[in-house]
């Protein structure tokens, strides 16, 4: 993580360094959790990485296919919000301090695979469209190794991506009014 070339990564390293410095200077106990690409009910539309699922589902809701920026080979580690909650509990119960853990599944999912999965789950027959991706894209591949979290705080992600996406789609379908309000609020910003 220390060979990044963007401000996003630099801020993450800075935050971790500050927490470590506080621990060693003032005795502040902490555990840092590095969440991979979190998804789930009530998902935020503003996040640079997490919004990809919601944007694809919005396109499908409009009767369009998902749009991928780039060739679809960019890959991420999608982890459910329920698994993130479990990681928080594991970290609070653990004896660990002054440590950082990846919260993810360790599973690599390309944007093309994600789009295909969403098309299958929604029974949408529209094709995926591809557009040029900006070279300013912050991260092109982000898959976390979950082994340290498993070994030291007892956390293992439990939710399969396909199952989690099914739950997310059901939530969207059950609460269309709230979804519309979130979309409108995001558009106003």
Which ranges hold each PLM region?
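Short-chain dehydrogenase/reductase
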Residues: 4-16, 47-54, 77-78, 108
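Catalytic helix-loop patch of NAD(P)-dependent Rossmann-fold dehydrogenases
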Residues: 1-32, 44
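Conserved sequence/active-site signature of Rossmann-fold short-chain dehydrogenase/reductase
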Residues: 31, 38-40, 84
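C-terminal substrate-binding subdomain of Rossmann-fold SDR/epimerase-dehydratase oxidoreductases
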Residues: 60-189
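Active-site loop/turn elements of alpha/beta-hydrolase fold enzymes
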Residues: 35-38, 71
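Conserved active-site helix of classical SDR/Rossmann-fold NAD(P)-dependent CH-OH oxidoreductases
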Residues: 13-20, 24, 54-57, 86, ...
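Active-site beta-alpha turn of Rossmann-fold NAD(P)-dependent dehydrogenases/reductases
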Residues: 5, 34-36, 104
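Short beta-strand->alpha-helix junction loop in the catalytic core
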Residues: 40-42, 136
């Amino acid at each position: 993580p220390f060979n990044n070339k963007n401000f996003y990564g630099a801020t993450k390293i800075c935050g971790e360094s500050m927490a470590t410095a506080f621990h060693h200077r003032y005795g502040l106990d902490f555990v840092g959790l590095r969440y991979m690409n979190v998804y789930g009910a009530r998902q935020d539309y503003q996040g640079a990485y997490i919004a990809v699922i919601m944007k694809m589902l919005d396109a499908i809701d409009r009767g369009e296919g998902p749009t991928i920026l780039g060739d679809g080979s960019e890959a991420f580690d999608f982890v459910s919000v329920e698994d993130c909650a479990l990681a928080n509990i594991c970290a609070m119960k653990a004896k660990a301090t002054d440590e950082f853990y990846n919260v993810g599944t360790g599973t690599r999912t390309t944007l093309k695979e994600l789009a295909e999965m969403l098309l299958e789950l929604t029974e949408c027959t529209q094709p995926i469209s591809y557009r040029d991706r900006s070279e300013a894209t912050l991260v092109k591949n982000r898959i976390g190794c979950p082994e340290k979290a498993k070994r030291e705080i007892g956390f293992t992600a439990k939710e399969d991506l396909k199952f989690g996406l099914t739950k997310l789609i059901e939530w969207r379908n059950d609460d269309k009014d709230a979804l519309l309000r979130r979309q409108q609020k995001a558009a106003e910003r």
